[in-house]
Amino acid sequence: MPSAEGPAAHVARALEEPTARQVATAFLSGSVRVTTRPGCPAGCLGVQGSLAAGDFGQPAHDTLAAWRDEVCSRLRDRFRRAVDEGDLTSDADTGLLARYLMTVSNGIAVQAAGGAGRDELQQVADAAL
């Protein structure tokens, strides 16, 4: 699971936000920032590494997929809490919300690796919300 330090620290911080919308906003904005940091490789190891793994890279693929699944589970749990607190409606599909954010975040990482800029990707994140 992402720690409070390092490239994925935005995940832990996002989960602490007081509302579901603020969680989603912090998560996607953090994804944009971390995948477009000056002086660092663009994209995300968790996405790129698992896509490029062949047979010999299966253990790495599995580890990175488990990491992404853990993030998705933590988002889902946070959205369930938002339902319990009345921040989201009782019929909100918390699993779908979490998977949606992960999918957008992963897409942001792929686009960043392909050369998309921070401002452009922030517009995508904003539109997704």
Describe each region flagged by the PLM.
Residues 12, 16, 52, 110-113, ...:
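Amphipathic alpha-helical interaction elements
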Residues 24, 38-62:
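Amphipathic alpha-helical segments used for helix-helix packing
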Residues 34-37, 81, 101-118:
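Amphipathic C-terminal alpha-helical segment
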Residues 42-48, 90-111, 124-128:
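Hydrophobic alpha-helical segments that form the core
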